[in-house]
Amino acid sequence: MPLKPLALSLQWGRFDAAAAQRSALPRHLIRRWIRHALTTDAEITVRIVGADEGRQLNRTYRNKDYATNVLTFVYSQAPLVTADLLLCAPVIEREAQQQGKHLQAHYAHMLVHGTLHAQGWDHEGSADADAMQARETQIMQALGFADPYARQPG
């Protein structure tokens, strides 16, 4: 299946490890990971933030007083997906370490996950969660990554 066109805007919040994260996440990889998850044309802004901004936005928009790995804000879906994906760098880094995953692999997974949300996928019920996880695994493996839901050794 051909990759869909993507207008990508990439923003970096102010946080301690922003420079290191930026060098580990070149724009062309972010674009590639998102495009593999798209089934329609898209305009997506990716903003990578620190814990304070991530917590504030999660509290404001989801009434949850903690920073989470990815938030998806959808403005339109087919025929053109328009969305913002907010990734919280410290949460993603901590999760990657805890799960024994390479940092880029976990970022790719969170971008795929958020992009699927932008297209209407969710994981509210167990059937939806199973379907979404299967799709994420398929995309991640097509990108050359391991199944993100496989148990890590150790």
Swiss-Prot record:
User: Where does the record place it?
Assistant: Cytoplasm
**Keywords, in A-Z order:** Cytoplasm, Endonuclease, Hydrolase, Metal-binding, Nuclease, Ribosome biogenesis, rRNA processing, Zinc
Question: What is the cofactor note?
Answer: Binds 1 zinc ion.
Tell me any Pfam family this protein matches. YbeY
**UniProt-listed Enzyme Commission number(s):** 3.1.-.-
- Positions contributing to Zn(2+) binding: 113, 117, 123
Gene Ontology BP terms: rRNA processing
- Quote the cellular component terms of the Gene Ontology held in the record: cytoplasm
User: Which top-rank group of organisms is this from?
Assistant: Bacteria
Please list the GO terms describing molecular function.
metalloendopeptidase activity; RNA endonuclease activity; zinc ion binding
Look up the record and name the cofactor or cofactors this protein needs: Zn(2+)
Q: What does this protein do?
A: Single strand-specific metallo-endoribonuclease involved in late-stage 70S ribosome quality control and in maturation of the 3' terminus of the 16S rRNA.
- Write down the HAMAP family for this protein, in alphabetical order: Endoribonucl_YbeY
Which NCBIfam families is this protein grouped with?
Answer: rRNA maturation RNase YbeY
Family, similarity comment: Belongs to the endoribonuclease YbeY family.
Name of the protein described by the UniProt record: Endoribonuclease YbeY
In the UniProt record, the gene name given for this protein reads: ybeY
